[in-house]
Amino acid sequence: MNPIVSILNRVNVPKKDKYRILSFPTHESYQTNLAETGHEFILFNRGGGNKIWEEKYKPLPKNTHIFNAITDTEYDIDFVLSQERFGQIQFAQEISKSLRIPIIHLEHIEPQLNNWPQEQFDHMRSFKADINVFITEHNQKSWGINDSVVVKHGIRTDDFNGWTGPADGDVKYVLYIVNGLESRDQFCGFTEWSAVKEKVEKIDPSIKFALVGENPGVSQPISNEKILVSSINKCACYINTSRLSPVPMSLMEAMSCGAPCVSSAKQEIPKIMQNDDVCTNDLDQMAAQIVKICNDKEYAVKIGSHCRNQIVNNYNIGDFVNAWNKIFDLAHEIRIGRVI
């Protein structure tokens, strides 16, 4: 058995009610879900052009704070959570050494094996933490770090709920929530989205495509979650054309709402959706499914119900919180020296 998984199953050191966890602004949606654990998160703003928290994407949770300087003496930090390998984990290692606290590393991305030389991949892979966490099994295998654990995404299914589709007489729109769709084509699939849009509009010109997110000159992000959920709940269909996102959280939130979703079949998405009719890399099939969903409410409800059930049963926030709390308890155990 994976030693990390084995240890997680037997953590029994007295736990703290609340940990103070030092991390960095990385992924607003994921951090918002991490805040559901109830612990205190101190996000260190490294400056120098590094990622900052974007309020336009998500408001800062109440138990999450931004600081420009931090000391263990002042804040009694329990451990550090790193979330990327492009400078963050290296910085976390310096903090770990200075403050003598464990590192948890959470890996969000897939290695770009087609673009990285082998030496670069080997170098990036060499950075490891006391506890290494991946968001999918595919992600874990791609990096080849076996001494690690997988934590599946969790969605707040009570908050992301209530799809009805457009009211009679309203425009039938196909929604995609994405930032930088055109500029991040290799990640988000602007080419595929444009092709599907053209195919759908040729079949049924009454169907429109809408974007939410930071797309200059086209759309803006929605930080108010209730308004965001309302946008999902009123769409006729949700589309995702991502190529390199292991787990597109916006897709999962739309699925949780019960919106009928059509997506590319990349990375972990087929495993999440479990429906080859609407999860495909065939652009003609994607277009045909969108047209059918937009014009057949009974079919749309069927697809949407399946989408929601997949999230409720397999990716709920309760399981996510429990998994992370086990990891935090293990990090605490490592810190006090009972597991090395």
Regions found by a protein language model. Name each.
Residues V229, L251-S256, Q267-P270:
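Short alpha-helical segment that forms part of, or immediately flanks, the ligand-binding pocket
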Residues N295-V339:
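A charged, aromatic-enriched C-terminal amphipathic alpha-helix characteristic of glycosyltransferases
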Residues N275-D284, K292-K297:
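Conserved acidic donor-binding segment of nucleotide-sugar-dependent glycosyltransferases
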Residues S142, R156-V218:
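Conserved catalytic-core segment of nucleotide-activated headgroup transferases in glycan assembly
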Residues Y238-I239:
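A short hydrophobic beta-strand element within the catalytic core of glycosyltransferases
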Residues A265-C279:
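Short acidic/histidine- and often glycine-rich active-site loop of Leloir-type glycosyltransferases
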Residues R243:
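Aromatic "clamp/platform" in nucleotide-sugar-dependent glycosyltransferases that forms part
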Residues A259-S263:
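Short hydrophobic beta-strand element within catalytic cores of glycosyltransferases
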